[in-house]
Amino acid sequence: MNRDAYFYLEMKEHELKVPYTGKNRRIRVLLPKGYAQDEHKYYPVVYMNDGQNVFYSGESFSGHSWKVIPAIKRNPDMPKMIIVGIDNDNEGRMNEYAPWKFSSLPILNFGLTLGGLGSEYADFFVNVVKPFIDSTYRTKPQREYTAMIGSSLGANISQYIGLEHKDVVGCLGVFSSANWLNKPEFDRYISKHKVSDQRVYIEVGTNEGDDTDKQLANGNLKQLYIDASLDYYRQLIDAGLSTSELKLNVVANGEHSEECWAKYLPECLRFISENW
């Protein structure tokens, strides 16, 4: 038993107005050990999408969380950091986590219009969330100390923000990216970008895909996920990153779930925080 893991981490909760919906969004902030005692210390910040799934399994969509609090407590040698969970928009999640409208999904045969608010969500993060966090807490606001982590569609929007706002975000954790949903659009977009001094951790399992995905794609879902991550790795190298700035983790039998992603969160945090 690791007695060093038994300590309290303070969490704060805030409501911030989302400009494109006019509604408030819950933002939760997990502060590092000793934050209140050392008033002269400043910290890197890790922003995590799908905030409902980040901290507690009881409120997670899947019934499993990312186990962020145990990950921090059980790895005390990692650099201290602030973790910010940004809730998704529930029924509007697919819209705000997709920079482009979906054009060729089976589900669209029912007359639905999905996607296309990713740019607005990115603006919300850059112009509302991050300035609020930087002004409220003792952060290191520079890009090299600012990370974003997401999974599935939450990974898609992380990939987009990492390119669109590369001057703001210097570290990414991309788990089980579903950018096969907008593959042609993403490929064109990333081909226009040059990237430098960014650390990116990429995780994908060999047993990806869930019941929701089956409504969104035809074909081999497992291969779609693997190809999306392998392509992204190569695209980042073409965009200017070195292999030392990238880590690709293909997990044998890894599934599309928080239970799987949580296992590799400490590895991700170690990699992106290497220079902190």
Regions found by a protein language model. Give the residues of each.
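Non-catalytic cap/lid and distal C-terminal segments of serine-dependent acyl enzymes
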Residues: 1-276
